[in-house]
Structures are given as structure tokens and as C-alpha cells.
């Protein structure tokens, strides 16, 4: 029996192409509520003013923020981890030197090493243009849970190759984009902490995701499901591949888990 349902957010629950959560996904989540614990697992930090409304919308029992850098159960913080300050400065300097687009969100403001590239990468996401861009150099002295690389696949590899203490799980195997996190963190790490807190095991869990930051979580869960719009490596690792998010993918995943019957 599935007692914990662990869900990625971007392009698993929220369809970026449509700019909304599919109606079928909304109804499916409401139908599941109360049948098992819902965990929201993302590269996002949901306590920031930009992302807090998502937390209120989904109302999860547990949250794995920033790929495991902060883990909450019913509002109780179980663990919080920040990037090493020296390593954080070094990777930001590296991004400036190589003209990479690296940055992150802090207290509702977006910081970047490359404003021009950031605006280009955000093209078609007009809702983000309302956010003023700030110099990522201001992040040197700010504790960050993670950084966001909005750049190519090659850029992600470049950082991973030069910083063994960091890893850069890809969001998309064609357009790139990656989270920049400590090498030991993952959503699976966060799920481990939640299960220990709840006194449950991985065999009682299911996980659904679409990108490489979901890989360890998909592999660790009792049942791992990849979205039809997910990256190929995740689909290969999954126990089941559901439909594309725009084709009722999340609903079909929950049907497969027999959570909607």
C-alpha cells in the first residue's frame, strides 16, 4: 500500500507550456488527499515569497525544498543545509569568468551572473519579466540552499567537471538548465529523513518526476514513475512511464498506483 506520494512540481504537477496545473491533475490530487501523505519535492525553495503560494495551493504533508537542502514534515523543519560559503563564491566567480547564467532567488529577488542570457532564456515566460534582475555578486555573503544554472547542457557539465563538491542534475536534456547543489544532496536524501520521521519505509512510497533531479528519488521509491515529457534517463530508470503532463500524465500515474479507485 502506498502511504507516501512524493511529487516533483515543475512539469510534473505544473505544466509550464500551458502555464497552469492541468484540471485533471488538480482533481486527482484532491481525490488522493487523505489516502496517503503527499510530499512536494522540488528544486524550488517554497518558503520564499515567490514560491510560498504553491505550498498553500498543494497543501503537502511534507516538503523537500531545493533538492533536499531543507526538509519539512507538517511544518517542522527536520534538516536545513546551505552551500559551503567558499564553494558558493568560487562557482559564482567561475560563472562570471565563463559567461554562464548562474544565480538564484533570495527574498523575492532574482540574482544572476548574466542578465542578458537570463532574459533570453526566459523568453516566452513573460510572467518572469516582472522580476527585476540583480547582480549575483550580491550573493557572495548570503547563505544559499542552492543555485540555479539557466544555461546549456554543456554549461552544466562544465560546472560539474570543475567542482567535484557540487552536482548539476539537468532539467532538460536538450535545452539544459540545472540545479547546482552539494554533491551529497538529493530528493531521495530528503525522502529518507521524512520516512524516518514518520516511521515508514521506502517500500511504502511512490514518486513521480520528469527531470534528472528526480532520478535518485525515482530509484529509491517503492514505485518510481516518470512523466511522458521527462528526460530519457529518468524514463529508463522508472518502473512506469505515464503520459505527457498535457495528456493527463499525473492523473494516469495516480491511476496506475490505484490511488484514484
Model-derived features: positions:
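Asp-based phosphoryl-transfer active-site loop
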Residues: 3-18
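Asp-based, Mg2+/Mn2+-dependent phosphohydrolase catalytic module
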Residues: 201, 220, 225-261
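Active-site phosphate-binding/coordination module
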Residues: 22-119
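Hydrophobic "anchor" residues on beta-strands that sit immediately upstream
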Residues: 4-6, 62, 200, 206, ...
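Conserved acidic, metal-coordinating active-site core of Asp-based
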Residues: 94, 98-101, 105-220, 229
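Short, well-ordered alpha-helix to beta-strand connector turns
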Residues: 2, 35-36, 60, 143-144, ...
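Hydrophobic/aromatic beta-strand patches that form the interior of the parallel beta-sheet core
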Residues: 39, 64, 206-208, 225, ...
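Short, structured coil segments at secondary-structure junctions
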Residues: 56-59, 67, 162-164, 220-221, ...
Amino acid at each position: 500500500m502506498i502511504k507516501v506520494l512524493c511529487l516533483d512540481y515543475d512539469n510534473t504537477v505544473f505544466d509550464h507550456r500551458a502555464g497552469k496545473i492541468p484540471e485533471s491533475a488538480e482533481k486527482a490530487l484532491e481525490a488522493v488527499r487523505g489516502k496517503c501523505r503527499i510530499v512536494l519535492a522540488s528544486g524550488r525553495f517554497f518558503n520564499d515569497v515567490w514560491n510560498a503560494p504553491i505550498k498553500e495551493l498543494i497543501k503537502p504533508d511534507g516538503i523537500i525544498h531545493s533538492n533536499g537542502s531543507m526538509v519539512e514534515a507538517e511544518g517542522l523543519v527536520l534538516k536545513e543545509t546551505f552551500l559551503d560559503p567558499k564553494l558558493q563564491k568560487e562557482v559564482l566567480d567561475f560563472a562570471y569568468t565563463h559567461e554562464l547564467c548562474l544565480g538564484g532567488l533570495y527574498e523575492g529577488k532574482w540574482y544572476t551572473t548574466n542578465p542578458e542570457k537570463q532574459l533570453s532564456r526566459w523568453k516566452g515566460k513573460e510572467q518572469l519579466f516582472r522580476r527585476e534582475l540583480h547582480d549575483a555578486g550580491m550573493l557572495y555573503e548570503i547563505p544559499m540552499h542552492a543555485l540555479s544554472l539557466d544555461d546549456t547542457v554543456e554549461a552544466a557539465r562544465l560546472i560539474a567537471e570543475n567542482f567535484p563538491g557540487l552536482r548539476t542534475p539537468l532539467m532538460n536534456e536538450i535545452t539544459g538548465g540545472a540545479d547546482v547543489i552539494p554533491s551529497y544532496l538529493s530528493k531521495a536524501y530528503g525522502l529518507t529523513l521524512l520516512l524516518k520521521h514518520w516511521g515508514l519505509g521506502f517500500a511504502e512510497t511512490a514518486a513521480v518526476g520528469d527531470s534528472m533531479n528526480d532520478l535518485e528519488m525515482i530509484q529509491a521509491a517503492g514505485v518510481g514513475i516518470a512523466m511522458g515529457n521527462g528526460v530519457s534517463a529518468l524514463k529508463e530508470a522508472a518502473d512506469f512511464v505515464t503520459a505527457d503532463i498535457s495528456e493527463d500524465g499525473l492523473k494516469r500515474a495516480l491511476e496506475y498506483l490505484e490511488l484514484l479507485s
